[in-house]
């Protein structure tokens, strides 16, 4: 399988395993009437979503828009789509022909695509408060990374599984909704919504005013984290807060990026991701001088 095919049809085994584990071990699901359960507090009908064609940066894409009508802040939303049962052989052949003409895929790999059921997905890790909306979320072929641009291809699929992550009492819960069985299942494990370092380094950088912080490397040399739910304006305000702490030595910057040292040699690195409304950040200690 060549690299193009891998990017095109990569399947998410982790998601499949998570659905299996949560559905089998938790034993907490709803019936088709939507009866409430202990851990599932999300009703999929409260997330109003739509997929259609749209123009993004001058190009036509198939995109997902949705509104959070739940009572909770959402941190992740993903929908996978599966091939409709009534797709004809002619429609499947036309789909494969379109793919073959659009991408550099060998005949051997095309045979593998022809043998697969059509699937697609759309996902975003935007942090969305109740009543807020998200637009222009790209849809992708299969579980890969190639953008979906033909609405006729989307018309060959139907919703399969929705994955929703939401905040409740400073924890992030994960819920799955199966459109086929009309049942919910919940992950037994939760995540801390705001993960902040307890090392001395954490006192050398402002705590972002957001609801979700995901920590990465965290030791005496460096503290790395991602903060979610920031606008570019909020990111620029955060830069100014870092400057007020003295991070103005040998600065490097452009829109969406800032890095500088303070007088003691500590460094901050800040990068803004406009697509996910998030900030990649780190604060690092001075490098030890070699003897």
For each predicted feature, which ranges?
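Short, hydrophobic/aromatic beta-strand segments
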Residues: 72-80, 90-97, 236-239
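Short aromatic-acidic-glycine turn motif
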Residues: 55-57, 83-106
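Compositionally biased P/S/T/G-rich terminal and signal peptide-adjacent segments
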Residues: 34-49, 184-223, 284-291
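Asparagine-centered strand-capping/turn motif at beta-strand->loop junctions
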Residues: 65-73, 86-87
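A cross-family detector of function-defining hotspots
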Residues: 211-273
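Short, solvent-exposed, Trp/other aromatic-anchored flexible loops in extracytoplasmic proteins
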Residues: 102-171
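Bacterial signal peptide processing site
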Residues: 25-28
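C-terminal motif of bacterial Sec signal peptides marking the signal peptidase cleavage site
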Residues: 19-23
């Amino acid at each position: 399988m060549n690299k193009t095919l891998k990017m095109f049809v990569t399947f998410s085994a982790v998601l499949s395993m998570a659905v299996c584990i949560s559905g089998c071990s938790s034993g907490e699901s709803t019936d088709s009437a939507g009866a409430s359960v202990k851990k599932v507090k999300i009703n999929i009908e409260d997330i109003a979503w739509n997929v259609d064609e749209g123009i993004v940066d001058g190009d036509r894409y198939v995109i997902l828009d949705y509104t959070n009508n739940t009572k909770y802040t959402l941190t992740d939303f993903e929908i996978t789509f599966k091939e409709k049962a009534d797709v004809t052989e002619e429609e499947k052949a036309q789909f494969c022909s379109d793919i073959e003409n659009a991408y550099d895929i060998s005949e051997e790999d095309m045979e593998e695509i022809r043998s697969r059921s059509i699937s697609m997905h759309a996902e975003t890790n935007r942090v969305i408060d109740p009543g807020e909306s998200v637009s222009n979320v790209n849809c992708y072929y299969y579980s890969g990374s190639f953008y979906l641009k033909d609405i006729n291809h989307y018309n060959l699929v139907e919703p399969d599984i929705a994955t929703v992550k939401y905040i409740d009492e400073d924890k992030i819960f994960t819920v799955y909704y199966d459109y086929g069985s009309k049942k919910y299942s919940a992950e037994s494990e939760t995540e801390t919504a705001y993960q902040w370092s307890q090392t001395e380094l954490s006192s050398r950088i402002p705590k972002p005013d957001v609801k979700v912080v995901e920590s990465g490397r965290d030791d005496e040399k460096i503290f790395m984290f991602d903060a979610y739910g920031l606008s570019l304006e909020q990111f620029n305000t955060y830069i100014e807060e870092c400057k007020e702490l003295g991070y103005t030595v040998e600065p490097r910057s452009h829109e969406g990026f800032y890095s500088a040292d303070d007088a003691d040699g500590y460094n901050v690195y800040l990068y803004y991701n406009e697509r996910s409304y998030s900030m990649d950040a780190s604060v690092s200690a001075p490098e030890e001088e070699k003897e």
